[in-house]
Design a protein with these regions (language model features):
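Membrane-helix entry/capping segments
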Residues: 88, 92-93, 99-146, 177, ...
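Surface-exposed amphipathic alpha-helical segments in non-transmembrane regions
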Residues: 3-17, 33-70, 93, 97-119, ...
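Hydrophobic transmembrane alpha-helices and their membrane-interface caps
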Residues: 145-213, 270, 703-790, 795-811, ...
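Signature of alpha-helical transmembrane segments and their immediate interfacial
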Residues: 232, 302-366, 788, 865-876
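Transmembrane helices with small-residue packing motifs
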Residues: 179, 183, 251-260, 344, ...
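Helix-loop junctions and hydrophobic alpha-helical segments within the transmembrane domains
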Residues: 122, 129, 133, 208, ...
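Residue-level signature of catalytic and energy-coupling elements of molecular machines
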Residues: 5, 42, 61, 102, ...
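Transmembrane alpha-helices and their membrane-interface boundaries in multi-pass membrane transporters
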Residues: 197-211, 233-252, 259-315, 453, ...
Length: 876
């Protein structure tokens, strides 16, 4: 029997401590050592000894195979059988350094391999990281140059230089502040520095420009530096605090995207705090001297001609700017102040028109735009129990269609280098779905019904056709494939979940499956939807064994039946030991050719306690059916998820989800009482993120209001300052229209951050206006004077923010495309809000003072009437 063979193996292969002997020379350990470690040693194991002394050995009754565990895993690389090794960084290791080391190892190893074996360097995420970092650094450098050019037109060259020097000082200091947050240098952290690039100089511009204005009044350099910094110190401090308050909500956004983006506010806030210290302490110190040292004189001599040219251009630009202020801005502002209600009506109408564009769907909202990657992945799910051979036929068909598409595209483009870099195939596993490498999990036996084909494309910069287009063409070429339960195509860089995902739950499973079919049909009817599927999967085919009543008369029990069938088909584990790094198990079971079909079970023989053997069919019955691959439950009810992908050029997930919820699901729930639903995937992620972002935005607005109320010592003036925020949002929305972008979650991130940046310029303008009023200037003229005097710093801070972000806004690389919406919101929002601030804030202040005057007169009139009524009574 199997048990007797297993016992013989255990008796023969043994490694057992036997105690020790305490001799005069010391302790000696005793050990019985006879562990068999290789297959051929097991062939001589004596199973039993006959009465005549002859031995029945294991090789006489069976075959010993020293091999690997049965597995359903197959990997191919460019059509060739392959084994895949993945290397990951650990701890604080640098991904780029690890990549370079592995690349060098492969180059060294390639020449040492035997003929017919090759080693290739496949998917390298560090290469993508390196490309993104290079791209962002390039954008940052270009943005820095644009900021300096912008500063040099508005300010004295030396002043522009010292203002710009605040950028590297703040950036370097930020690396110290972000250390506790475990932030690393990656795409998002570098983007955060780009966001801060234009904003960080705002306070330095205000301080530097005010120092420059005091110099023009004839003050000595030291006095001008002190007076200029002190005069704007309060508004500068509070402007930084409002910016910090605006970026703070981004740190507390819930959901996957909130965690993903949390590094941005950490870095921007760190940079802003350091820029405040630099602008109020370090910058005035630099500007307090005339710069007549030896280095300055040498620099002036070497670059005399360029400096002279710059001075002429800067003076001409300054004269032109002053003429524009006097001849264009001031007349427009005076006209707006004479007609404040008309001006406010025009502004509000523009705001309502923009809101209507968004609400009417003319500007669409997508939670996470589809960002193209350099990969096209096809996931194949066959019915549970499908063999590797059957799955392989479907995979080979898809591989053939993928190669057909490659030939078509290569012929169309005429490029010498193919559009494909590599083709990976995995049968028994879906490694991309597990977000690991292309290799299977160590020790996994694989699942023959799963497969995946992944195509690596040339980098997006080197091809004219996008991965989404390639995915669409491949989907059409593959067509309907008989056999798979689901066939899913994807080419996005990352995803927050399925764009359409609805979970249906019911206690009645039959009712649930019927509702699932109706929902799938409804979703498939929307234009632009694809890969419509549900999460319910039938399990593998099962043979359920039962003992016949007559078997008990032979002394057999159900346990006997189960044990003998298990020994024959799964195996009886006789031993388990370690051989090198391998875990070796000695299994005793039927040969593989006797474990291939259902007839092998029916034809096996069952041994009775008396030692007799009877046919399986005489003592057992078989019931064949399907089990369940997995059972999902929520609150005790069965749950099935229906999901689908969409083509964003044709359909909008938000609109489809809304239509399903309002026009389909209510009727479905009426037809199936007890049915419940909830949205999952991207929609659930969106709900979590937007709800927390909205709540945090309200808190941030309140914090900004409180911060503004302190320097103004007023409850009403902060409302005038904050009135610029909605118009910044208008600029952000129109910026998306101009750039042909949909609004996305990152657009909202930019809008929230914009709210703090926009109020800074309004704060500076109204602070100067209050100063003029305190000096006794008429209010109307004070508004014109404040707008004119603060025109240059307001325009300059807005332009530096915009130009700092401009390279990112215009970036065409797919690598940075998902970051562009936030840059557009900030850049265009601040640019548009500038004109509203210069005209709208004075108008808002004019309206506020008119309302305050009305109530003051009303209150004074009531007081006079009361006094007049009381006078006769007093006289009497």
């Amino acid at each position: 029997t199997f048990a007797e063979v297993a016992a013989a193996v255990r008796r023969t292969s043994i490694d057992l401590p036997a105690g020790s002997v305490e001799s005069e020379d010391g302790e000696v350990l005793l050990r019985t050592q006879g562990l068999l470690r290789v297959g051929r040693e097991y062939e001589d194991v004596v199973v039993l000894t006959r009465p005549d002394g002859t031995a029945l050995r294991l090789r006489d009754i069976g075959t010993v195979i020293d091999g690997f565990e049965d597995t359903d895993l197959v990997s191919r690389f460019n059509g060739q059988p392959a084994a895949v090794i993945s290397a990951y960084r650990t701890g604080d290791q640098n991904a780029i350094d690890i990549s370079d080391y592995v690349q060098q190892y492969i180059d060294d190893k390639r020449g040492l391999l035997p003929a017919g074996i090759d080693i290739a360097y496949a998917r390298d995420d560090a290469r993508i990281l390196r490309g993104r970092i290079d791209l962002l650094i390039r954008n940052a450098q270009l943005g820095l140059v644009l900021v300096f050019i912008c500063l040099s037109f508005f300010l004295d060259l030396r002043l522009a230089f010292w203002v710009m020097m605040g950028i590297p000082i703040s950036f370097l200091g930020a690396f110290v502040l972000i250390e506790p947050f475990d932030a690393s240098i990656n795409m998002l952290s570098l983007f955060a520095f780009i966001v801060a690039l234009g904003i960080v100089v705002d306070d330095a511009i205000i301080v530097g420009e005010n120092v420059f204005a005091h110099r023009e009044k004839g003050k000595p350099f030291l006095r001008a530096a002190i007076d200029g910094a002190l005069e704007v110190g309060t508004p500068v401090v509070f402007s930084i605090m409002t910016s910090v308050a605006a970026f703070m909500p981004l740190f507390f956004v819930e959901g996957m995207m909130g965690k993903f983006m949390s590094v941005i506010p950490v870095i921007v806030i760190s940079v802003l705090i350091l820029s405040l210290v630099e602008s109020l302490l370090i910058l005035p110190a630099h500007l307090s001297s005339e710069g007549n040292g030896a280095i300055s004189r040498l620099f002036g001599k070497v670059f005399a001609k360029p400096l002279a040219l710059h001075n002429r251009v800067a003076k001409a630009f300054d004269r032109s700017l002053k003429r524009s202020i006097a001849n264009v801005y001031q007349p427009m502002l005076r006209m707006a102040l004479r007609n404040p209600i008309t001006s406010a009506t025009v502004a509000i109408s523009l705001m309502l028109f923009t809101v209507g564009l968004v609400a009417g769907g003319h500007i669409k909202f997508v939670f996470m735009p589809q960002i193209e990657s350099d990969w096209v992945t096809i996931k194949i799910n066959m019915p549970q129990g499908t063999t590797v051979a059957q799955t392989s036929k479907v995979v080979e068909y898809i591989e053939a269609r993928a190669l057909d598409l490659r030939r078509q595209i290569d012929e169309e483009t005429g490029d010498a280098e193919s559009i494909y870099r590599n083709v990976f195939t995995s049968i028994g596993d879906q490694p991309t779905g597990r977000r690991t490498s292309f290799s299977a999990v160590r020790g996994a036996s694989g699942q023959g019904h799963l497969a995946e084909v992944t195509i690596e494309l040339k980098p997006s910069e080197q091809r004219d056709i996008g991965s989404t287009k390639i995915e669409s063409r491949l989907r059409a070429l593959v067509g309907e494939v008989p056999g798979p339960e689901s066939l899913t195509f994807s080419s996005s860089l990352f995803s927050a979940g399925d764009p359409i995902s609805v979970e249906l739950a019911s206690a009645d499973f039959g009712q649930l499956l019927s509702a699932v079919d109706r929902l799938k049909a409804r979703i498939a009817g929307y234009a632009g939807t694809s890969d419509v599927q549900d999460s319910f999967q039938e399990g593998k085919l099962e043979m359920k064994l039962q003992l016949k009543p007559q078997a008990r008369t032979l002394g057999l029990t159900l346990n006997d039946l189960a044990r003998q069938v298990r020994q024959g088909f799964y195996g009886d584990q006789a031993l388990r030991f370690q051989r090198g790094s391998d875990d070796v198990r000695v299994m005793i079971r039927y040969p593989k050719q006797e474990r291939r079909n259902l007839g092998d079970v029916r034809s096996m023989r069952i041994r009775t306690p008396a030692g007799a053997e009877v046919p399986f069919s005489e003592v057992a019955t078989v019931d064949i059916g399907h089990g369940y691959a997995a059972i999902q439950r929520t609150d005790g009810q069965r749950v099935v998820t229906v999901s689908a992908s969409i083509d964003e050029k044709i359909a909008n997930a938000d609109e489809i989800n809304r239509d399903i919820e309002t026009s389909f699901l209510p009727a479905l729930m009426q037809d199936y009482p007890g049915l419940r639903y909830r949205f999952g995937g991207e929609q659930a992620e969106r709900s979590d993120s937007l709800a927390s972002l909205g709540m945090n935005f309200v808190i941030a607005l309140f914090a900004i209001y409180v911060l503004l109320a302190v320097p103004f010592k007023s409850y009403s003036q902060p409302l005038v300052v904050m009135s610029a925020i909605p118009f910044g949002i208008i600029g952000a929305v129109w910026g998306h229209m101009l750039m042909d972008l949909d609004l996305a979650l990152l657009s909202l991130f930019g809008i929230v951050a914009l709210s703090g940046v926009v109020v800074n310029d309004s704060l500076v303008l109204l602070a100067y206006y209050n100063q003029l009023v305190a000096e006794g200037r008429p209010r109307a003229e004070a508004l014109v004077e404040a707008g004119s005097q603060r025109f240059r710093p307001i325009l300059l801070t807005s332009l530096t923010t915009f130009f700092g972000l401009l390279p990112m806004i215009l970036e065409k690389s797919m690598q940075a495309r998902f970051l562009i919406p936030m840059a557009v919101s900030l850049g265009f929002g601040i640019l548009f809000a500038t004109f509203i601030i210069l005209l709208g804030v004075p108008v808002g202040m004019r309206l506020l003072e008119g309302v305050q005057g009305f109530f003051a007169r009303l209150g004074a009139g009531e007081t006079s009437d009361a006094e007049a009524a009381a006078a006769p009574a007093t006289g009497s």
